[in-house]
Amino acid sequence: MPYMLVRHRVKKYATWKRAFDEDAEARKAAGCLGGQLFRNHDDPEDVMVLLAWDSADKARAFSRSTPVRDVMDAAGVIGVPSIVFLGDTERVEV
């Protein structure tokens, strides 16, 4: 399964989270299957988003789209996000 890992700083987490939640239907329509949010323990404005996609090509296209960039800007994303595309390799136990 393809994943997209996004890491960025935000001005205010609550503002960013509201914008992220409001964009859920756009993500779903683009092929996103859901995911998980993470915050840095030492810096709660450092946010990581791991999203599963039905195709890597759709994830890449979504990440490059103007509407996504506009949402990020309005949500208070600081600077250029780090975006990495991942493939599911192996699940490991303790």
Report the location of each language-model feature.
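Short amphipathic alpha-helical segments
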Residues: 12-34, 67-71
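Residues that cap or initiate secondary-structure elements
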Residues: 12-14, 55-57, 89
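Glycine-rich beta-strand-turn "strand-cap" elements at beta-sheet edges
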Residues: 30-46, 70-94
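Residue-level detection of beta-strand scaffold positions
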Residues: 16, 24-25, 49-51, 85
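Short, well-ordered beta-strand segments in beta-rich or mixed alpha/beta enzyme
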Residues: 2-9, 36-65
